[in-house]
Structure formats: C-alpha cells, structure tokens
Regions:
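P-loop (Walker A) phosphate-binding loop of NTP-binding proteins
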Residues: 8-9
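Hydrophobic positions on the alpha1 helix immediately C-terminal to the Walker A/P-loop
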Residues: 17
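Post-Walker A helix-loop "phosphate-sensing" segment adjacent to the P-loop in P-loop NTPases
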Residues: 23-32
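ATP-dependent NMP and nucleoside kinases share a basic, alpha-helical "lid"
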Residues: 82-139
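ATP-dependent small-molecule kinase phosphotransfer cores
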Residues: 34-100
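Extreme N-terminal starter segment of soluble prokaryotic enzymes
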Residues: 1-4, 30, 100
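Conserved lysine of the Walker
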Residues: 14
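Small-molecule kinase domains that catalyze NTP-dependent phosphoryl transfer to phosphate-bearing small molecules
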Residues: 116-118, 122-176
Length: 176
C-alpha cells in the first residue's frame, strides 16, 4: 500500500490526476480522501450549500482549524480511512489484484509533513500555471508552495498528457 499526500492551488487538477490514476489501476486500488472531507460534512450540517466560493473556502479553513485545535478530528478521520484502505489492500493482494494507493488531499505544510511521517507518504504537488495567479481567500490555499514536495506534476497540457504523467508516477512507485 502506498500513500500520497497531494496538494496544489485550487483548480490545479489534483482530482483529475487522481482520476487518471484510477483509470490506470481501477477505483478499487486508488482511493481519494481529503483532510477536509469530515469538515465539509460538519459544514453542511451547519447550512453550507456545498459551493466552494472564496467565502466558503475561508469558512471551511477556519472550521478545520477549530476542529484540529479542539481534538485533532480531521487527522483522526483521515487515519481511519487510511486504516480501512490498508485492510482493503491486504484483501486485494490475497485475491491477486495488486497493491493500491490512497491520495490524501492536504494544504497545510505542517500537516503535510505529519502525514508524510505518519504514513510514510510521498508528497505530490500538482501545478497549473493558469490558476496559480489567482489570489487565495485563506491561509491554507495561499500556503500551497510553502513546502518542498517529493514530486511535482506539471498540469499545463491536456488530459492525455496528464494521463501519461499519472502512468509514470505510478510506475515510479512500483504500481502497475
């Protein structure tokens, strides 16, 4: 089982990159989770409409900070998902399906490092020049480049190019 912490500016193509990996390995072997998944559930319970505009991005960032400060909830929720994925990978290997990878979306440099150390993860930055020029609405989004990533994926081309980069990335990790 491999773990990748993935980051990039909003709309850089992080989910599209993960989808390319899913096309190559199958969705059973590639999972996608974010440190804000549970935060979004709480926000929806509080009336958030699910639209990520600048105001809601700021709200989600602040809510995540509060839940982290209170009891490290976002990290604990991600750890549960990683544990579930680990069990699923063990089951799949017994069936001869092959190993898998879980992508954890995370913005904050300190949390990226913690995830890397806790799960022996590779860190991935997805870059797309056209979206990097926009001003960010919160500290988490504006700190994307405040970390030294293991791998940088340049997403300035088309989908077939990104697909080829996903193929190379998975191959380098020994996942085929």
């Amino acid at each position: 089982m491999r773990v990748a912490v993935i980051n990039g500016a909003p709309m850089a193509g992080k989910d599209t990159f993960v989808q390319c990996c899913q096309l190559l390995l199958g969705s059973v072997r590639v999972w996608n989770v974010s440190t804000v998944d549970f935060v979004k559930e709480v926000a929806k319970y509080c009336g958030w409409n699910g639209i990520k505009d600048p105001a809601s991005r700021r709200f989600l960032s602040q809510l995540k900070d509060s839940l982290t400060e209170w009891d490290d909830i976002p990290f604990k929720k991600v750890a549960q998902v990683v544990s579930n994925f680990q069990r699923e990978c063990s089951r799949l290997e017994q069936l001869g399906v092959g190993d898998g990878i879980i992508f954890i979306h995370c913005r904050e440099p300190k949390e990226i490092q913690r995830l890397k150390e806790t799960f022996n993860a590779v860190t991935v930055l997805v870059r797309r020049e056209v979206v990097e020029k926009y001003e960010q609405s919160n500290g988490a989004d504006s700190g994307v480049f405040d970390y030294e990533y293991d791998v940088t994926i340049d997403n300035n081309g088309d989908i077939p190019e990104l697909h080829a980069k996903a193929c190379s990335f998975l191959s380098e990790l020994g996942l085929e």
